C-alpha cells in the first residue's frame, strides 16, 4: 500500500488504483448504494473461498469460454426445465405401462423421444459444466478433470436412463407391444429423480422462498408419486391377470369398458384409501397376487407413514436444524428491520451477513477446533494463516516463534460487501489482515465521505490505532466479499513485548512503512486514559521515537508528539531525538522538536549537547537555530561551547564556533573563558588561535588573584566541599545480608550526576557501570541523584534491566 498526501488533497499510488476524492453526503451514499453487490440472487450462488486462500476468483457466477458455471442463471434455468421433464417421465412411464397395454399412443411416443433427446443433450452439456470439489470446496473449471469426474460417477446411469428401450424393442421385434424385459429396463428412467432431490435441497436454503411451503411441497410430491406408482401397479396386476372375473376391477360393473380416466381415477382412489389406512372395502383383493401386492404395499405404508409423521419430524428438526435456525434468524431479522423501519441498505447488509455466517460455519468449524488439543490447534492455524501473515509488512523479519503465537490467536471472518469493519474514531480493539477480497479506506468529515484507496490481499489495517493507542483515523469498509483475520490489539502488544528484537523489528517496519507515506496524517493521537497517568506514553512507540527522527519523517514525528509523547526521551547512550536530528542535519525535525518544547540543554553520556552535535557535524544552519533558542534561556551557552572546544583542543570546532559569531571572551558557568582553559591545559595551538581572534590576554593573569589553572582548581575544590560523601557497595543489600557478605565498600565524593556515580562505581569494582541499578539499604531503586544525601550507603546491582 502506498499513500501520498498533500496539503490540499490526497492522491493514492497506482498499486491501490488511485482515484480522486469523490465526496458525497451520507444520504447520497445510501441512494448510490449498489444493491447488486448484495443481491439475494447472488448470495444464493456464492462460493466461499477456503480459509487462508488469497488468490480466489469471485467471478465464478459467470460462465467463461466453453466451461459453464453451475451458478450461472441460464444453467439454473436449464436445470429447472430438466426437473419438469423428470416429473413428466416419472408420471408418464408407469401410466403407459399400466393403462396403455405397453402400446403408447403416437403423441406420447413422440413426446417420450423428445424428452429422451433433451436428456441426451444434458449428458453432453454436463461435460462442460464446472463442479465444486467436495474436498477443497473450490470450483473446478479444468475440462479434463470435469470429464474424468463425470465418467467415473453418474455417466453410465445417465446414459442408461436415456436409452429409448421401447423404440429399440420395436426395431428388434417389429411390434409396439413390449415384453417385461423392456418394461424393467424402462424403470431406469426413475434415476432422473435425483435431480428433483437436488432442486428441493437448494430451494430449502434459498431465502427468497418460504422454507415451510418448500418442505410441504416436497412431502406432497413424494406422496403423490408413490400413490401414482402404487395405483398403476395395482391396475397392471388386474389387467395382466390371466383369469378374468377374479380381480379387484370386477367390483365395478363394466370396468374394462369404461373410459381411461375413470379407470385411472379408480386405481388412484384405491391407492389413497389404502395408504391412509382407511380401507372402505369397496375395492378389495380378489386373487392371491393382489393379496400379496396389498400386503407388501401395506407394509410399505407403515414405513412411509413413519417417514411422513415420525422420521420426517426428526429429519426436519435435526437434519435441517442449522437451516431452520438460519431461516428463523432471517425471519427475526426481517421483522426487526420492518419494525424499526431501517433503510434498505441496512436490511440487505443484515441479511447478507447472516447468509455468509451460515455458509462460513461449515468452513470454520470453530466448535470443532476448540475441542482439539492446543498443539493440534496451533498446527491448524499455522497451516491456514501463516502464509498470509508472512506477507504483511509489519511482520517482515519477525521470528517464526512470534508469528506462530500471533496466528494461534487469529480468528477468520467472512465479511459481506459494503460492511464497515472498522468505524472512524472507534477504539483500536482489533487489527485485521486481508486474506481475500478488497477493503476501502474512507475518511469521514462531517457528512462528507472521501474514499482514499483500496487495500487488498496481504494488507493490514487498524495497526496505526493499535500501536499508537489512539482512535481509528478512518473507516474501513469491504468492497467485495472478504476473508479477514482478526487479531486482538491487546494480544498483539503483549506478543511484541516478549522478544525485544522482534518488538524493534515490527516497530521499525511500521515506521519505515509510514515513512513511505511521507506526509501521512495519522490523526490526533491521544494517549490512553484508563485511570493511569496521561503523561505516561506507550513504551512500544515512545522508546522508538528516536527511530522516527532517524528516518527524517518530520510529519510523522509531529503527529507522534501531538500524542503527548515526550520529545526528551533518551536512548541507551543518553541521546535525545534532538541530538539525532542535529547530528543528521534534519532541520525540519529540529523545528518540530523545538515547537513541542524539547530541552535543548540535555547532554548525553559523553556530556555532549545537541548544539555540540550540530557544530561538530557541520550543520551550521541547525546550529544557528539551536543557539538562538539556547541563548535565550542560558546566557553562558556560548562560553560553555568555547570552553568545551578549548578543553578538547578541537581547533576545527573552535574556528567554526568563532565563525558563527560567538564572543571569544565569553565566560562559562564557572566564570572561565576559553583562553583560560587552553592555558590551563597547556594547549598552545588553541591559545594562539584564540589570541589571533581577539581574546583578552590581559585579564587572563589579572583576573582576581589566581592564574587560570589555579582558578580552575579553586572552583573544583569549592564544588567538592558542596558535595556530600557516600559509601558504595557491590551487590543487592538483601542478597548481601542473606550471604552475610563482609566485603568492604568504598567512600567517595558524590558526583554531580547518576551516570557519573555509576561510572565511578564501575571503575572501583571493575564492572560496566552503565549496566547497573543503584539501590539504597532497603533495596529501593534510585533513579535521581537529587534523592541521595550525605553519608548514604548505595548498592550497585549488576546485569539488571533498568
UniProtKB/Swiss-Prot annotation:
Top-level division of the source organism's lineage: Eukaryota
Binding site for a nucleoside 3',5'-cyclic phosphate: 394-513
InterPro entries per the UniProt record, alphabetical: Ankyrin_rpt (IPR002110), Ankyrin_rpt-contain_sf (IPR036770), cNMP-bd_dom (IPR000595), cNMP-bd_dom_sf (IPR018490), Ion_trans_dom (IPR005821), K_chnl_volt-dep_EAG/ELK/ERG (IPR003938), KAT/AKT (IPR045319), KHA_dom (IPR021789)
KHA domain location: 725-802
Residue ranges annotated as Cytoplasmic topological domain: 1-79, 131-153, 205-218, 310-802
PROSITE patterns assigned: ANK_REP_REGION (PS50297), ANK_REPEAT (PS50088), CNMP_BINDING_3 (PS50042), KHA (PS51490)
Intramembrane residue spans: 266-285
Carbohydrate-modified residues: 179, 254
Location in or out of the cell: Endoplasmic reticulum membrane
Keyword Secreted: no
GO cellular component assignments: endoplasmic reticulum membrane; monoatomic ion channel complex; plasmodesma
Membrane topology per record: Multi-pass membrane protein
Stretches of the chain found on the membrane's Extracellular side: 101-109, 175-183, 240-265, 286-288
Protein name, per record: Potassium channel AKT2/3
Amino acid at each position: 500500500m502506498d499513500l501520498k498526501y498533500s496539503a490540499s488533497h490526497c492522491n493514492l499510488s497506482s498499486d491501490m488504483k488511485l482515484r480522486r476524492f469523490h465526496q458525497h453526503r451520507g444520504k447520497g451514499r445510501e441512494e448510490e448504494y449498489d444493491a447488486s453487490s448484495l443481491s439475494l440472487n447472488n448470495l444464493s450462488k456464492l462460493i466461499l473461498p477456503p480459509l487462508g486462500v488469497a488468490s480466489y476468483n469471485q467471478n465464478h457466477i459467470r460462465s467463461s469460454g466453453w466451461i459453464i458455471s453451475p451458478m450461472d442463471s441460464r444453467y439454473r434455468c436449464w436445470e429447472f426445465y430438466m426437473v419438469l421433464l423428470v416429473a413428466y417421465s416419472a408420471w408418464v412411464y408407469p401410466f403407459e405401462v399400466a393403462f396403455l397395454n405397453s402400446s403408447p399412443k403416437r403423441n406420447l411416443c413422440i413426446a417420450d423421444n423428445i424428452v429422451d433427446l433433451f436428456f441426451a443433450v444434458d449428458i453432453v452439456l454436463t461435460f462442460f459444466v464446472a463442479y465444486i470439489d467436495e474436498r477443497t470446496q473450490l470450483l473446478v473449471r479444468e475440462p479434463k478433470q470435469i470429464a474424468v469426474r463425470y465418467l467415473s460417477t453418474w455417466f453410465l446411469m445417465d446414459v442408461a436412463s436415456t436409452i429409448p428401450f421401447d423404440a429399440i424393442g420395436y426395431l428388434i421385434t417389429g411390434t409396439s407391444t413390449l415384453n417385461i424385459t423392456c418394461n424393467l429396463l424402462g424403470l431406469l428412467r426413475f434415476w432422473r429423480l435425483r435431480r428433483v432431490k437436488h432442486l428441493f435441497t437448494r430451494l430449502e436454503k434459498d431465502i427468497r422462498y418460504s422454507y415451510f411451503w418448500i418442505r410441504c411441497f416436497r412431502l406432497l410430491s413424494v406422496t403423490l408419486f408413490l400413490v401414482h406408482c402404487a395405483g398403476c401397479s395395482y391396475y397392471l396386476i388386474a389387467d395382466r391377470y390371466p383369469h378374468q372375473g377374479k380381480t379387484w376391477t370386477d367390483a365395478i360393473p363394466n370396468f374394462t369398458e369404461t373410459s381411461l380416466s375413470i379407470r385411472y381415477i379408480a386405481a388412484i382412489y384405491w391407492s389413497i384409501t389404502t395408504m391412509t389406512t382407511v380401507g372402505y372395502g369397496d375395492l378389495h383383493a380378489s386373487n392371491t397376487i393382489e393379496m400379496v401386492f396389498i400386503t407388501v404395499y401395506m407394509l410399505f405404508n407403515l414405513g412411509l407413514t413413519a417417514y411422513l409423521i415420525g422420521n420426517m419430524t426428526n429429519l426436519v428438526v435435526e437434519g435441517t436444524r442449522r437451516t431452520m435456525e438460519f431461516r428463523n434468524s432471517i425471519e427475526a431479522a426481517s421483522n426487526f428491520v420492518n419494525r424499526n423501519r431501517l433503510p434498505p441498505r441496512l436490511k440487505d447488509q443484515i441479511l447478507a451477513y447472516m447468509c455468509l455466517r451460515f455458509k462460513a460455519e461449515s468452513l470454520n468449524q470453530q466448535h470443532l477446533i476448540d475441542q482439539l488439543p492446543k498443539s493440534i490447534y496451533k498446527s491448524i492455524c499455522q497451516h491456514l494463516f501463516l502464509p498470509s501473515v508472512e506477507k504483511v509488512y509489519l511482520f517482515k523479519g519477525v521470528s517464526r516463534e512470534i508469528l506462530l503465537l500471533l496466528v494461534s490467536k487469529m480468528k477468520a471472518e467472512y465479511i459481506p460487501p459494503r460492511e464497515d469493519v472498522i468505524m472512524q474514531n472507534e477504539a483500536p480493539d482489533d487489527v485485521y489482515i486481508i486474506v481475500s477480497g478488497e477493503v476501502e479506506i474512507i475518511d469521514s468529515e462531517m457528512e462528507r465521505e472521501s474514499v482514499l484507496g483500496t487495500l487488498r490481499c496481504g494488507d493490514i489495517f487498524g495497526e496505526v490505532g493499535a500501536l499508537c493507542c489512539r482512535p481509528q483515523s478512518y473507516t474501513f469498509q469491504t468492497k467485495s466479499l472478504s476473508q479477514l483475520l482478526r487479531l486482538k490489539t491487546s494480544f498483539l502488544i503483549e506478543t511484541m513485548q516478549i522478544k525485544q528484537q522482534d518488538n524493534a523489528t515490527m516497530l521499525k517496519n511500521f515506521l519505515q512503512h509510514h515513512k513511505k507515506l511521507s506526509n501521512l496524517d495519522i490523526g490526533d493521537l491521544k494517549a490512553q486514559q484508563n485511570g493511569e497517568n496521561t503523561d505516561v506514553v506507550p513504551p512500544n512507540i515512545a522508546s522508538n521515537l528516536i527511530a522516527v527522527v532517524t528516518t527524517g519523517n518530520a510529519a510523522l514525528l509531529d503527529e507522534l508528539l501531538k500524542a503527548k509523547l515526550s520529545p526528551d526521551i533518551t536512548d541507551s547512550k543518553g541521546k535525545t531525538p534532538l541530538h539525532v536530528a542535529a547530528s543528521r542535519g534534519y532541520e525540519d525535525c529540529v523545528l518540530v522538536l523545538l515547537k513541542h518544547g524539547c530541552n535543548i540543554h540535555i547532554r548525553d553520556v559523553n556530556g555532549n549537547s545537541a548544539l555540540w552535535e550540530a557544530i561538530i557535524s557541520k550543520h551550521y544552519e541547525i546550529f544557528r537555530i539551536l543557539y538562538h533558542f539556547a541563548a535565550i534561556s542560558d546566557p553562558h551557552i556560548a562560553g560553555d561551547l568555547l570552553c568545551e572546544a578549548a578543553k578538547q583542543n578541537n581547533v576545527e570546532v573552535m574556528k567554526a564556533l568563532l565563525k558563527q559569531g560567538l564572543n571569544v571572551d565569553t565566560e562559562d558557568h564557572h566564570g572561565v573563558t576559553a583562553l583560560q582553559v587552553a592555558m590551563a591545559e597547556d594547549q598552545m595551538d588553541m591559545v594562539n588561535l584564540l589570541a589571533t581572534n581577539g581574546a583578552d590576554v590581559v585579564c587572563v593573569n589579572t583576573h582576581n588573584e589566581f592564574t587560570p589553572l589555579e582558578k580552575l582548581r579553586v572552583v573544583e575544590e569549592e564544588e567538592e566541599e558542596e558535595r556530600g560523601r557516600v559509601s558504595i557497595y557491590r551487590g543487592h543489600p538483601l542478597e548481601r545480608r542473606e550471604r552475610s557478605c563482609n566485603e568492604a565498600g568504598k567512600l567517595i565524593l558524590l558526583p554531580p550526576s547518576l551516570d557519573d556515580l555509576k561510572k565511578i562505581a564501575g571503575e572501583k569494582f571493575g564492572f560496566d557501570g552503565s549496566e547497573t541499578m543503584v539501590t539504597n539499604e532497603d533495596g529501593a531503586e534510585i533513579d535521581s541523584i537529587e534523592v541521595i544525601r550525605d553519608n548514604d550507603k548505595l548498592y550497585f546491582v549488576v546485569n539488571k534491566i533498568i
